Amino acid sequence: MEVKYVTVGALTKYIKRKFDVDPHLRDLWVKGEISNFKQHSRGHMYFTLKDSQGRIAAVMFAGYNQHLPFRPEDGMNVLARGEISVYEPNGNYQLYVKEMQPEGVGSLYLAYEQLKQRLEAEGLFSPVHKKPLPAFPRCIGVVTSPTGAAVRDIMTTIRRRYPLAKVILFPALVQGDGAAPSIVRAIERANSFGGVDVLIVGRGGGSIEELWAFNEEIVARAIFASKIPIISAVGHETDFTIADFVADLRAPTPTAAAEMAAPHVGELAERLAERKWRLIRAMKEQLAADKEQLRRLQGSYAFRYPKRLYEQKEQQLDALLERLSRQRERLVDKHRQRLHELDMRLWRHHPAAELERMKERQKAAANALEKAMRTAVERHRFRFRSNLARLEALSPLRIMERGYSLVYNEQGELVKRTNQLRIGEHLSIQVQDGRVDCQVTGVEEKHV
């Protein structure tokens, strides 16, 4: 009997088709806790959803997760929407997630808190980075929608308070898709425009979704990177956006931002009037003090007898002139003596004098050399004679003059002992005036 079978691959494909055609598994929300979360280098997210009764593998591809407003983490309870299917290579079923949000907490709020903590840790909110606002700006830039109420409020407030300032609008989207990049581009244009002293970035009020562009990371980093001081004005009294934390100054409304950026001409006039009054009062007080001092000086001894002021100084001047004259004479004598010394040194170093001295030294050296040579010759002559006398005293010829002779054997060797001789051996005897040949007839050894 032939057994019917299916291959593993065919069975897996069959089960996968069952999952794929089941309407209950094509689009569903799954609640669970994230564990084993990993994000691939290509952006895909892999994790497990679990509860007390089970677990299921899940994947969220980069095309879906790039728009997530929060960062998934292990231990986070979420609601995940997607479809169930089978991953054929290992036969496991898993949830293919297309949408996800935190359970119990709005995803926007979670994203806000996560970004806030991260940027604060990087130091973007630190007071050390806050730039001061100019006291009297000549040009005020505004980044907002050109059609909203915020731009009208800002323009009206600045013209009313400080008409001396020029206002430049850098239009941008302030809500919806593309709002955050639009705000970033407007801030960058304001920085590259040149001449903008302070920048207001904001919009009128709205829901958190409408204001969300001001919570985007790219907007926060553009505000932080701005060289121009920025006032955030996102039209809400109580809540803060990320832009508020990064900006150099936060205003609760666009109107308040305009008031912070532009001083009031009336207030300036009052301050100028007050300073003018204070200056006049100070000048009057100083003038009165100077008059009183002049009155006291006019009644003083010096003003009554003015000659006494310079009589003593004249005497001191005479003494100083006398000291100066003596000092000048000493200085002239000193330089005269110095000139004489230099003249003597110059004479000593004159070429003729130097040549004469060199001739004297050469003559003295020649005499000394001649004397030394004579002494050396005499010394060597004496040594030669002494050595010659010693050599003559040691010469064999001198010895033979005293009766001695030299005896040589047949081999021509000098005979010094009797043991060198044999009977019948011929000898040669060298005397002072010649040689004698003889033969040994007997040898007698002398014992000492």
Swiss-Prot record:
Enzyme class: hydrolase
One Pfam entry name: Exonuc_VII_L
Cytoplasm listed as a keyword: yes
Gene Ontology CC: cytoplasm; exodeoxyribonuclease VII complex
Coiled-coil boundaries: none
Enzyme Commission number(s) from the entry: 3.1.11.6
Keyword flag Nuclease: yes
CDD domains assigned: ExoVII_LU_OBF (cd04489)
Transmembrane segment boundaries: none
Superkingdom to which the source organism belongs: Bacteria
Gene Ontology BP terms: DNA catabolic process
InterPro entries named among the record's database cross-references: Exonuc_VII_L, Exonuc_VII_lsu_C, OB-fold_nuc-bd_dom
GO molecular function list: exodeoxyribonuclease VII activity; nucleic acid binding
Keywords recorded for this protein, A-Z: Cytoplasm, Exonuclease, Hydrolase, Nuclease
Similarity field: Belongs to the XseA family.
NCBIfam families reported for this sequence: xseA (TIGR00237)
Record note on quaternary structure: Heterooligomer composed of large and small subunits.
Protein's name in the database: Exodeoxyribonuclease 7 large subunit
Species for this entry: Geobacillus kaustophilus (strain HTA426)
Organism phylogeny: Bacteria, Bacillati, Bacillota, Bacilli, Bacillales
Gene behind the chain: xseA
